[in-house]
Amino acid sequence: GDAELAKARATKKAIEAKKDTDVFADWNRLSIQVQDFGYPVYLLQSVATDKATRDAAQACLEKLLPFDTEMAQSEPLYRRVRAVKPKDAIDQTFKQDLIEKFEDGGATLPPDKRKRAQEISDEIERLGLQFNKNVNEDPTTVVLTPAEAAGMPEAWLAARKRDANGNLILGLDYPTVVPFLQNATSDAARRKVWMAKNREGGEQNLLLLDRALKLRYELAQLHGMPDFATYAVKRRMAQTPAAVNEFLGTVQAAVDEVEARELAELRADKAKFTGTDPAVPMLYRWDVAFHQERVRRARFKIDQEALRAYFPTDKSVLYTLKLAERLYGIKFVERKVPVWHEDVRYFDVFERVPEKNAPGKI
């Protein structure tokens, strides 16, 4: 991390000292240099199965965090970008995007405010990393008896860990939680799993969110904005929080009737399933996916679990890649590279046009 940051800063310093107008290409090369190192590290921080690797990646990312703000606050780079005479509409758009990035990053603020803006931006990024880490490494499990897992497919049950008494030990990962909420017949068990999933990250993440909200407000104030919402949407199509709220109100009014009808349908299904008066049952968050799945099966005769047999994973992945090749004029080539889990597959992506042959990767 230290070495890569030093290289990036050296490249940035060299670009700042240049006098020519090819700043767009310089900016692009520097961005690629940073991303080629930073993105794989970010991926490892999120998915590596070894905690030591995740922790090392986290520490590395925290060292790299200040650089993006340093680029956005560079006065020499800002002056170079402003001096560029765009050759075409693409250059004009890129120039405008960069100018806005500089202005939003604090390049035009007085020195004291600029320094504080960098401190705030860096801390917000660190809070985000820690928030994600708390979610990814939450050790919470939900222990259920076999009876509480009634309704679950055999394949799902076979893949779950069990304790010495035969009880299921459920993690909070997507392949565990989503099928359970869709299929488990016990509303009490669904509630346990739903509550655990929605508390993922724990109380610590609530403190991080509170701190981030305060920092965002302070950042908006530094830029002369009344709140972070105004600061965040000023460059976007909506431009103002009022326009966003008006749009959301329009959407809500348009879907109110449909939402009420669908909720009534789900409540009716719950009443039928539980044998209660249709006017009685409350529909809770942990009920929704279960009764949506029941209604879907009854109305369309579609069973997601039954469909799995027709879409084996390996063949489905290859078909999707072949389809993408036809649609986008690209070519996927599988490679053997070091990966963080035995199930991970690596593909290089190439344009089909031979003279370009520009590689990417997934």
What do the predicted segments below correspond to?
Residues Y39-K51, L181-K197, R235:
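Short, charge-rich amphipathic alpha-helices with coiled-coil/heptad character
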